[in-house]
Regions:
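Short, flexible helix-loop junctions that flank or precede catalytic/ligand sites
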Residues: 1-193
Length: 193
């Protein structure tokens, strides 16, 4: 197992790919806005798409969100708030994911889900305490490999990965917001920065 602190340049990309080609498990970090964005970034740094597709197993993207403190305020989304959310994510996908997670019943809509807001206290003036990750896990399947070889855009790779079941960071954040771990506002703040 080889850990590369961060891949920033062509030389580091080349070393990581060569190590992976010789059978080493290589773990590294890379600065991108999404899991799918890592692939064009590697290509921009000089990695050949056929080498990326044969050496990459999975990409995990993460952002840290603040955790709600124990004192929090319960609320439900208005129709207007749901309409505003559609500019950040697919409301239908979020609804389906919440149903799969048993956070929403079959006949219910997103407006029926209880979400939580921060509540200021003496101990936690902003209503938050600690942090946790929201994640996007992109497995490199055969169809994703062929998109890599075709030099497809991050958007095309993301779209295909979502069709194959990948949950985006926003969607993962919504699950955690519905569980009362963080707030929708915090999720949107972090993913739109």
């Amino acid at each position: 197992i080889l850990m590369v602190g961060e891949i920033r340049d062509e030389e580091t990309v080349s070393l990581a790919i060569n190590a992976a080609l010789t059978g080493h498990l290589v773990l590294s970090t890379l600065h991108t806005n999404s899991a799918a964005g890592a692939i064009p970034r590697l290509i921009d740094m000089g990695a050949e798409p056929f080498l990326i597709s044969s050496t990459l197993n999975v990409i995990v993207a993460q952002r840290l969100v603040r955790r709600l403190a124990e004192e929090k305020e319960k609320y439900t989304l208005s129709d207007k708030e749901v309409a505003n959310l559609s500019s950040h994510c697919s409301v239908e996908r979020v609804t389906d994911i919440l149903r799969n997670q048993k956070l929403l019943k079959l006949k219910q809509s997103l407006q029926d889900v209880s979400f939580w807001r921060p509540k200021a206290t003496k101990e936690n003036p902003d209503g938050y305490k600690g942090r946790m990750g929201i994640y996007e896990v992109l497995p490199i399947t055969e169809t994703i490999k062929s998109l890599i070889i075709q030099r497809s855009s991050a958007d095309a790779i993301q779209e295909r990965a979502q069709q194959e079941g990948m949950r985006t960071m926003v969607e993962d954040g919504f699950v955690k917001a519905a569980q009362g771990i963080t707030s929708i506002e915090e999720v949107l703040r972090v993913v739109t920065e």
